[in-house]
């Protein structure tokens, strides 16, 4: 019986020691575990947030690069289109116009009509003096003189037209004033280009 009482007291002492020492340690360990879990949770959340920010920044930079690339491609496309338009204008419009003008303005009848128009314009403005009429280098002076007749050739300095250095068309010079009225093929080309090129571009490249 005495041993039983002794065993009971020993158990009581052990239980008391457990409550006094082990229980606080267990509680402390539980608290540490809880804190560790909370800290790990915060670290994971912070890492996820940082990863999200890094991803957003990377996506934004990628979009900027794509946008810059699109702008560069657009500008390059516009430059290429403009270069193509210029090439088409030079090939179709200007070259065709040059060919047509040279064909038309080397006709003696056209040269005659241009000289007559210029002489009449000067007379209408009351301008008089020695006149020299130049024609294109591929035009026959004899043919133009015959078409002009003496009514006009007598007003010319040499009583005849003079062959110029240009292809077609005419130039009329007022010697005393050193005026040159230029309707040569090259001058007519510039006039036609200035007034017709815009219409040509709109007609050919409408909607482009």
From Swiss-Prot:
GO terms of molecular function: ATP binding; proton-transporting ATP synthase activity, rotational mechanism; proton-transporting ATPase activity, rotational mechanism
Species per Swiss-Prot/TrEMBL record: Chlamydia pneumoniae (Chlamydophila pneumoniae)
Protein name: V-type ATP synthase subunit E
UniProt cross-references to InterPro entries, sorted A to Z: ATPase_V1_Esu
Biological role: Produces ATP from ADP in the presence of a proton gradient across the membrane.
Annotated family: Belongs to the V-ATPase E subunit family.
GO BP field: proton motive force-driven plasma membrane ATP synthesis
GO CC field: proton-transporting two-sector ATPase complex, catalytic domain
Keyword annotations of the record: ATP synthesis, Hydrogen ion transport, Ion transport, Transport
